[in-house]
């Protein structure tokens, strides 16, 4: 299965993408993680992207498309993939189609802006491997430490409330129109992100027609 997850920053895309990845046996391709790795490594792409991410702005399409194309060409994507954070604009969606990257389903996670601001205040991320946690909804086994690699978790600058609101404005202006774009193609499925992580996962499985 080849699908992408849509939703505002903090809507739970990363968490649900990881669950779907294990369920379907296909990799999650997170543009956010790819870019953060590039920033951490000090690559030219990372340095170019850093100023946009820190301000809550979108990274230019040409940078995103190049990174995604390289990743999808790897062997582990042959049987399918889950895109997390791509596309973010209609031009990006059109570029995916133009480059022969076809999707089976587009899943949109729905949640209010105020709920997102509250949730992101509790988000913690691993600067080394990119794993994401939440102090209440998805805490690590040891407080402040990544389960996967043991690195101390951090609060990202773009999770600050004022930056979150800026990112939400960008989302509504530039990314939300994708729902209409994919609805016209018959690919869109929407799921309300309410209840526990497990509740939302069950609703996603039902929407995609896969068993628990």
Q: PLM ranges: what are they?
A:
Residues 1-212:
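Glycine-rich phosphate-binding loop of ATP-dependent small-molecule kinases
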